[in-house]
Amino acid sequence: MSNIIKQLEQEQMKQDVPAFRPGDSVEVKVWVVEGSKKRLQAFERVVIAIRNRGLHSAFTVRKISNGEGVERVFQTHSPVIDSITVKRRGAVRKAKLYYLRERTGKAARIKERLNRVG
């Protein structure tokens, strides 16, 4: 029974999800329905948490909008998500960046992760 469920979940998982980690700045384009119109809406900022659960995986993105912190949880393999683009790699040492909720301005900055050559 569980093999059948795993196979069905594997078929529904998206294959084009880029590799990103907490601390990375990402742009998530989401389909939004307003009345009878359907359009793409971009949500861009820092990934503060990732929950890896196969088909049920999710990640949390936090941004500051008009001085207010806005967090949005996205299901990684949701059909509502059109694309995920990594804009900037962040160098952090924790898996969950919930401490950014209390920080604003320059205190909430994250160093950029540089890839080693060689």
Swiss-Prot record:
InterPro entries: Ribosomal_bL19 (IPR001857), Ribosomal_bL19_CS (IPR018257), Ribosomal_bL19_sf (IPR038657), Translation_prot_SH3-like_sf (IPR008991). The keyword Ribonucleoprotein applies. PROSITE patterns: RIBOSOMAL_L19 (PS01015). GO terms for biological process: translation. Keywords: Ribonucleoprotein, Ribosomal protein. One of its GO terms (cellular component) is cytosolic large ribosomal subunit. GO terms for molecular function: structural constituent of ribosome. Belongs to the bacterial ribosomal protein bL19 family. PANTHER family: LARGE RIBOSOMAL SUBUNIT PROTEIN BL19M, RIBOSOMAL PROTEIN L19. This protein is located at the 30S-50S ribosomal subunit interface and may play a role in the structure and function of the aminoacyl-tRNA binding site. This is Large ribosomal subunit protein bL19. It comes from Serratia marcescens. The lineage of its organism: Bacteria, Pseudomonadati, Pseudomonadota, Gammaproteobacteria, Enterobacterales. The gene is rplS.
